[in-house]
Amino acid sequence: MNKSDILLNSINAFYILPENRTILKELLNKTGGISLRNLEWFITNYSKKNNLTYKTRDGKLFSVHCAYKSSLDGYSKKLFDPFCRSNKMQYIVPGTSDKISTTVAQLNFIRWCIKNSIVDYIRNHHSDLFNKSGILQKVTPV
């Protein structure tokens, strides 16, 4: 087994949970109100510029940009990337018969966003982050 296969086993265990599966499908099918491009921009630009730190669901203090850089260093772009820049595969979403064209790197990135409450944060602050034209705007972090 290579790194990608080992990671995929862990990813499958994560996406077997219905709430995680739902968020994955919403992001990849563009039905949840958050695009992958906006998610990536929020993590790489907004969180760095605003030094964004918040408490996650389990009460831990989380610094978005620092954690992102640390995860990127640990996984590299080959295994941690919001966009399908490597070999795509037909991923069967655990617990369903749904197939999605994606990469291990993209599945891992989305898992990281869900686990660290980034998707929740963007949803809870959506009106503050986005203006009416759909562009992220600078706001003071909460």
Question: Where are these predicted regions, by residue range?
Answer:
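Amphipathic alpha-helical interface elements that mediate macromolecular binding in regulatory proteins
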Residues: 78, 107-112, 116, 120
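Surface-exposed beta-strand edges and their flanking turn/coil or helix-capping segments
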Residues: 54, 95, 136-137
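Long, compositionally biased non-globular segments that serve regulatory/targeting/scaffolding roles
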Residues: 1-80, 91, 104
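Long, highly charged low-complexity segments enriched in Glu/Asp and Lys/Arg with interspersed Ser/Thr
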Residues: 115-141
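Amphipathic alpha-helical interaction segments
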Residues: 49-50, 87-90, 116, 120
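Low-complexity, intrinsically disordered regions in eukaryotic regulatory proteins
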Residues: 80-103, 107
